[in-house]
Amino acid sequence: MHGVLAVFTAVAMLSGCAGDRDRSNDPRATPPWLYEKAQDSIKSTNYTNAIFFLEQLESRFPFSDEAKQGQLDLMYVYYRDGQFESAIDAADNFVRENPTHPRVDYAYYIEGLSHYDPSRGVLERLFRVDTTMRPPVGALEAFTAFSTLVDRFPNSEYAPDATQRIKFLRNRLARYEAHIAEYYIRRGAYVGALRRLHRIIETYYGSDSTYWALEMMLESYRELGLGDLAADTERLLEENAHLKNSKS
């Protein structure tokens, strides 16, 4: 009996969803109604329905009071549904069209998250495998989005979490550059190595590869016979002694 009731309940719920979708195409469907249905779907984690209602709201009522909040909700739902590219596109569009909106910080946050999650990869997330020797797909974009958020909106409620993610990404991106620099150094290609080492210092300063990069710069300058630059690098090593032994 309980099984029969469960089946009837599921059928009724599906019928209700279908009915709401049918009504969304009715000219009498209003922005508040579409937004309410989207919120109900989000609360029940029915992201497919939420996306449907929010997309209807955006396409049919772009100038309604609910439209802007609907756009923010839509990028969130795309992200939660694993549609990262759609979330990134929605966030980019929102930032471009609403640069002074009071919640534009949230758009940067969602953009960063949508690049960040895929950038870590399944092996790294599940088995803690070091994937820093592989190209960090999405990591640089996530780093840029989170950095923009923290720089432009230091008091944002999303800034603390973004800051923690920046630390992780800074280390990851720097380690990737370090692997390439090591490859060049092993082959005596010191000019190529220096390009990567400079990037670690200039772009990812404070990462756990910073002091190591300075040491490798010193070695490279000496190998190239560039005494003045080697001396400058020695001074930088002294100034950054607090970062010694940070590279694992």
Where in this protein do the model-derived segments appear?
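Acidic, polar-rich low-complexity tracts and alpha-helical solenoid repeat scaffolds
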Residues: G16-S248
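Sec-dependent bacterial lipoprotein signal peptides
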Residues: M1-C17
